[in-house]
Amino acid sequence: WIMGHMVNAIEQVDEFLNLGANAIEFDIDLDKGGIAQITHHGIPCDCGRKCTKKAIFTEYLDNIRQVTTPDDPKFREQLVLLALDLKLQRISSAKAYRAGEDVAKKLLDHYWQRGNSRARAYILLNIPLVEDYEFIRAFKDTLKNEGYESYNDKVGINFTGNEDLDKICDVLEILGFHKQVWQADGITSCFARGTERLKEALEKRDTPGYNYINKVYAWTLVRKSIMRRTLRLGVDGVMSNNPDRVIKVLKEKEFADKFRLATYNDNPWEKFRG
């Protein structure tokens, strides 16, 4: 999976898909009450990027629904995964549950259209810190209460704050979440990062019987040398400001026979058995 990073303006969706991304990440900015308002990162952000691009969240969902609906004029077959980077660190943890309710209802109304939409992308909920786990509980409760538990099959979770992996496992146990879990490891493209935690996540992913990590990805990669180093470790995906660079690296002799781009037929919740 190649995730286009910080795709917050509607016009950026096609831009990143044209560069080769098959997944996009966008930031969800919430008001103090936990209501999702806009797709927006804000300052600071990655080096060399404009931090202020944005869209109304519901309008963004309306557009991305079309982009991921077969036979729609806007349909782009390659886009199979949407990563919602939830800026919960900007609000009180006490509002995390309210935020989970709101985001779930907005997805029901504007993306899935309560069963009337054929939009098919998988959804990855990126949670910054384990202290905000009530967002996940609320999201699942809302799908159940609204009568759409079936959409749980399309939704995975991911904690992005580089916290202790065992601590994350403990929270997943509390939530009863034993599948559909991704694990991110990374840092802004402005700085270098070692691979110790990334290797630990990959080791846990590959441990027989360990169900708390199905996929591992690294962020935010812009240098080809770092992309190569990361691919050699065996990650499932990378997040990048430059998907075209990732494509070029994947075509190199060292990687061409080991990796391919994920398609809709690849289940993002299953461990890859090479």
From Swiss-Prot:
Subcellular location: Secreted
EC code: 4.6.1.-
Binding-site list for Mg(2+): E25, D27, D85
Organ and tissue specificity: Expressed by the venom gland.
One Gene Ontology term of the molecular function aspect: metal ion binding
Catalytic residues of the enzyme: H5, H41
Cofactor mode of binding and number, as noted: Binds 1 Mg(2+) ion per subunit.
Record's GO cellular component terms: extracellular region
InterPro entries xref list: PLC-like_Pdiesterase_TIM-brl
Role, per record: Dermonecrotic toxins cleave the phosphodiester linkage between the phosphate and headgroup of certain phospholipids (sphingolipid and lysolipid substrates), forming an alcohol (often choline) and a cyclic phosphate. This toxin acts on sphingomyelin (SM). It may also act on ceramide phosphoethanolamine (CPE), lysophosphatidylcholine (LPC) and lysophosphatidylethanolamine (LPE), but not on lysophosphatidylserine (LPS), and lysophosphatidylglycerol (LPG). It acts by transphosphatidylation, releasing exclusively cyclic phosphate products as second products.
Family stated for the protein in its record: Belongs to the arthropod phospholipase D family. Class II subfamily.
Record's protein name: Dermonecrotic toxin SdSicTox-betaIIB1biv
